């Protein structure tokens, strides 16, 4: 099991993630895309990465908007696993621009 990060550790790590915030034991972000197809394409790519990492986001999609929250349920908070997936998500989104 991964160790839960302290709020100080989380805030420090978030400095490297533009647009991500910490609240309610999770890190959160949102993205806006050109259209639904682009949003869904990114979601599909994230889904494959999440499966590969065996770590899955809590997310929602309405048309061209995607909201993502990451936490590690076993740790009841945020761990390194969340930041690893967040980095992969950032890379996926960046590669679509």
UniProtKB/Swiss-Prot annotation:
Disulfide bonds: none annotated. Transmembrane segments: none annotated. It is an enzyme of class 4 (lyase). InterPro entries: PCD_sf, Pterin_deHydtase. It comes from the Bacteria. Coiled coil: none annotated. The keyword Membrane does not apply. GO terms for biological process: tetrahydrobiopterin biosynthetic process. The keyword NAD does not apply. Keywords: Lyase. GO terms for molecular function: 4-alpha-hydroxytetrahydrobiopterin dehydratase activity. Its EC number is 4.2.1.96. SUPFAM superfamilies: PCD-like. It catalyses: (4aS,6R)-4a-hydroxy-L-erythro-5,6,7,8-tetrahydrobiopterin = (6R)-L-erythro-6,7-dihydrobiopterin + H2O. Belongs to the pterin-4-alpha-carbinolamine dehydratase family. This is Putative pterin-4-alpha-carbinolamine dehydratase. It comes from Christiangramia forsetii (strain DSM 17595 / CGMCC 1.15422 / KT0803) (Gramella forsetii). The lineage of its organism: Bacteria, Pseudomonadati, Bacteroidota, Flavobacteriia, Flavobacteriales.
């Amino acid at each position: 099991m991964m160790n839960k990060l302290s709020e100080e550790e989380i805030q420090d790590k978030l400095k490297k993630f533009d647009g991500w915030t910490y609240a309610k034991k999770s890190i959160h972000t949102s993205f806006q895309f050109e259209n639904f197809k682009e949003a869904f394409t990114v979601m599909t790519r994230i889904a494959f990465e999440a499966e590969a990492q065996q770590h899955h986001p809590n997310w929602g999609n309405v048309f061209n908007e995607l909201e993502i929250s990451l936490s590690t349920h076993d740790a009841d908070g945020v761990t390194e696993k969340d930041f690893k997936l967040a980095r992969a998500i950032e890379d996926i989104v960046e590669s679509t621009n």
